[in-house]
Every structure is written in C-alpha cells, then in structure tokens.
Amino acid sequence: VIVFCLVNTYDKLKLHEIHLRSIARAIPLCYAYDFHLALYDFPFWKNVREVVEDVVNYTTIGDPSYAYTLLEGNRIHLIDSFPAHFGDLIATTPNPDRKKALSFEEMVRVISERSTTFLIGLGRRGLPKDLMERARYHFEATGRGVSLETCTAMGVVATTIHFARVIGWRR
C-alpha cells in the first residue's frame, strides 16, 4: 500500500479554501496512481464522507467520481496518528537529512518491499520538525534541492512514486 498523506501545516482551527483545493488536487493523483489519500491533522471533519462532500461541492478541480471512487474503496483516511499498516513514513522535502535521504533507486526497493506513507506538508513551512524526525526516510524529488510550490510538488512526487513502483514491478 502506498499512502499519499497531506499534512495540515496551515490553520488547524478554521477550514480555509487552500485545504479544500489541496485535497481536490491530490484526489485525482491518488485515483490515477492507485494510492490511498490520508489527511493528517485536519480536525474540521468527523468522517471522510464529509471531506468528499465539502471538496466536491466547493471546488471544480477534477472529476468528482474520482473522490467517490476513493471514498467507496476506503482509500481516504482522516488521521491524527499513523497506523502501523501505513508502513514507513517518508518525508518529502527539498532539504533531506543526509542520514535519512532516500534515492530514487532506494525508493524502488522500499516501496516494492513494504507499505509506505509519503508525507506532503501544505504551505511554505513544509513539514513540522517532529514529523521530519519521525520519518524513517527523507525524499527530495528534484535531485537538486529545489523547493516547489505545494501542488507542483504533489504532482512531481506522485509521478515519481508511480514510476518507482512500475520499475519495481518489472524487476
């Protein structure tokens, strides 16, 4: 299982448009690449059906059927901790800790051997320090330490994971 996890680093007290739009942009990526979508530290909803309804009703990004397909397949998760079955945590960052840095080649191996959760921080601040420390690996997607806008990073990371998985299947 591969989990694409959006980490709320914006406001935790009030739902903002950026929350909904980021989720709306992640849904088609998860649908296309057969990932689960986890939302970490999003206290605005009681259940995932509320999330899907709010995203579908508020945004015009993507085909709503993708969200409902993920929902019906139990592939959207509201979490405030990381269940063991989500596997290894992989922080996405332009500044990986050298000791935790995960190369593309290593990613191919890791995702073919076990479940993984890729953490994507929303906003300029990136992932909180505690999650960076908890993550088993750090993945830098550009190969050059370039900081990307959040939704651009989501697309790059999702596509990179997909290609790593395809390569792993062929080995």
List each language-model region with its residue ranges.
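RNA substrate-binding interface of SAM-dependent RNA methyltransferases
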Residues: 1-95, 162-163, 169
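Residue-level signal for well-ordered alpha-helical segments
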Residues: 7, 12-14, 116, 130, ...
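Secondary-structure boundary/capping motif
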Residues: 14-15, 47-48, 99-100, 127, ...
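Well-ordered, non-membrane alpha-helical segments in soluble/globular domains
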Residues: 19-25, 104-108, 154
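Short, well-ordered alpha-helix to beta-strand connector turns
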Residues: 34, 86-87, 114, 134-136
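Short secondary-structure transition/capping segments
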Residues: 49-53, 103-104, 152
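Long, charge-patterned amphipathic alpha-helical coiled-coil/hairpin "stalk" segments used as oligomerization
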Residues: 93-131
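Structured adenosyl-cofactor binding patch, chiefly the S-adenosyl-L-methionine
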Residues: 127-171
